[in-house]
């Protein structure tokens, strides 16, 4: 099982996720609370190579053979085969952002940094004055946006280009950054009417929509509760719960959801 600790998805969500990953699709996990959407996204880093080489000092994890940032391109032109290399562990190749109403385009994509321009005595037309947002900094990584409907429509629109073409534009700069990012989005359909929605063109650009679900059997539900309950040995000695009580509690949950 590529997703240890995820129970009840062996014949539904996990095969769908495997197919989406093999197809190099961006993924939307659509489901209610407590259905392991974010946990599955976080466990995807275990499928990555343990280490990858990057150009040392690069803000956006430039591939030494295919640099995209001005910093890495200039450094490789200057030093050639002597370009310093750093090794990035897979645990560092994961970015996550909770969609809230105050998230801006600058947070996600980037903006011009006037302080950097002043310190380096550079014009605002120079590529080196850019301050990269969290998405470019997640180049060659997995980037997760939780609760996508909460993201304002104009912010969702800013993701169109990177999802469709794999590149982005910052503040009208004529630069093309062909980023290598796997996007994973999570959304709760119950929240659509309360707080917002996913704009249709964005939904069209997310190639795989995977529906998560609550456990379908009582046995799976019992296993999940046993796994997730934070009960230490001291508590277990003091409190005894019969198997019948546990089953009744799970059955009540099943009936309530029905």
Descriptions of predicted regions:
Residues 1, 195-197, 208-258:
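Conserved C-terminal "switch" segment of AAA+ ATPases
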């Amino acid at each position: 099982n590529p997703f240890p600790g995820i129970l009840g998805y062996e014949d539904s969500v996990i095969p769908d996720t495997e197919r989406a990953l093999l197809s190099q699709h961006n993924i939307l996990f659509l489901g209610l609370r407590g259905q392991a959407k974010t946990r599955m996204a976080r466990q995807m880093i275990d499928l990555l190579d343990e280490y990858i080489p990057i150009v040392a000092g690069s803000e956006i994890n430039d591939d030494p053979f295919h640099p995209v940032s001005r910093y890495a391109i200039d450094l490789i032109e200057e030093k050639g085969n002597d370009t310093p290399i750093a090794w990035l562990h897979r645990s560092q190749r994961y970015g996550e952002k909770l969609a809230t109403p105050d998230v801006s385009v600058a947070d996600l994509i980037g903006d011009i940094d006037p302080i950097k321009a002043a310190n380096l005595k550079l014009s605002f037309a120079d590529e080196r004055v850019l301050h990269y947002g969290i998405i470019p900094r997640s180049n060659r990584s997995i980037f997760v946006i939780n609760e996508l409907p909460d993201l304002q429509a104009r912010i969702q629109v800013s993701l169109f280009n990177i999802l469709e073409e794999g590149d982005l534009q910052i503040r009208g700069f004529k630069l093309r950054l062909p980023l290598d990012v796997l996007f994973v989005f999570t959304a709760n359909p119950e929240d659509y009417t309360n707080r917002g929605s996913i704009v249709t063109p964005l939904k069209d650009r997310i190639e795989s929509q995977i529906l998560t679900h609550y456990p379908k059997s009582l046995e799976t539900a019992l296993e999940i509760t046993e796994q997730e309950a934070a009960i230490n040995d001291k508590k277990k000695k003091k409190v005894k719960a019969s198997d019948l009580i546990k089953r009744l509690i799970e059955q009540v949950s099943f009936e309530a959801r029905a």
